[in-house]
């Protein structure tokens, strides 16, 4: 079965169950932390794919990755147990990402990423967040990243759109224009 189809089925079932129980917000936080753990700790996936590691140890590892030292919700533990029992732990990263997407659609939350060459103050960040929320008619989750390689300006990703106003991109365009003009001369 395809990764996307399987992940969507599990995530959709989980969000419907969470809505019935009224715990979708808590599960969102747990799946958000779990997906972040997969991103920053690539060895987590390798351990979950290892057949030598017991299901009990995998469950403890996943709960720790999702909540740190806190206690995982009963619904989260039951869901992870189901995934482990069906030997779908290799899909857990994708399931958690699908759950996040479904939750954001359900709660009308947009995702934005602001990349700048220098740190942005909180006031500017809040103005960007509120402007994007007004345009999308949704709440915004805004992640700010500092990347000196863009040399100045900013890159703003919002949902599936990108506004690139970086100096590095503008310089690349000017360079490409010079190259194109020189090709015509030769």
Curated annotation (Swiss-Prot):
Keyword Cell membrane: yes
Subcellular location: Cell inner membrane
Tagged with keyword Iron: no
Recorded GO MF terms: proton-transporting ATP synthase activity, rotational mechanism
Gene3D superfamilies: N-terminal domain of the delta subunit of the F1F0-ATP synthase
Domain of life: Bacteria
One of the protein's GO biological processes: proton motive force-driven ATP synthesis
Keywords for the protein's UniProt record, in alphabetical order: ATP synthesis, Cell inner membrane, Cell membrane, CF(1), Hydrogen ion transport, Ion transport, Membrane, Transport
Membrane topology reported for the UniProt record: Peripheral membrane protein
Pfam families given in the database record: OSCP (PF00213)
Gene Ontology terms: cellular component: plasma membrane; proton-transporting ATP synthase complex
NCBIfam families on file: ATP_synt_delta, PRK13429.1-3
Function of the molecule: F(1)F(0) ATP synthase produces ATP from ADP in the presence of a proton or sodium gradient. F-type ATPases consist of two structural domains, F(1) containing the extramembraneous catalytic core and F(0) containing the membrane proton channel, linked together by a central stalk and a peripheral stalk. During catalysis, ATP synthesis in the catalytic domain of F(1) is coupled via a rotary mechanism of the central stalk subunits to proton translocation. This protein is part of the stalk that links CF(0) to CF(1). It either transmits conformational changes from CF(0) to CF(1) or is implicated in proton conduction.
Family the UniProt entry places it in: Belongs to the ATPase delta chain family.
Self-association and partners: F-type ATPases have 2 components, F(1) - the catalytic core - and F(0) - the membrane proton channel. F(1) has five subunits: alpha(3), beta(3), gamma(1), delta(1), epsilon(1). F(0) has three main subunits: a(1), b(2) and c(10-14). The alpha and beta chains form an alternating ring which encloses part of the gamma chain. F(1) is attached to F(0) by a central stalk formed by the gamma and epsilon chains, while a peripheral stalk is formed by the delta and b chains.
HAMAP family: ATP_synth_delta_bact (MF_01416)
The protein, known as: ATP synthase subunit delta
Organism: Bacteroides thetaiotaomicron (strain ATCC 29148 / DSM 2079 / JCM 5827 / CCUG 10774 / NCTC 10582 / VPI-5482 / E50)
Lineage: Bacteria, Pseudomonadati, Bacteroidota, Bacteroidia, Bacteroidales
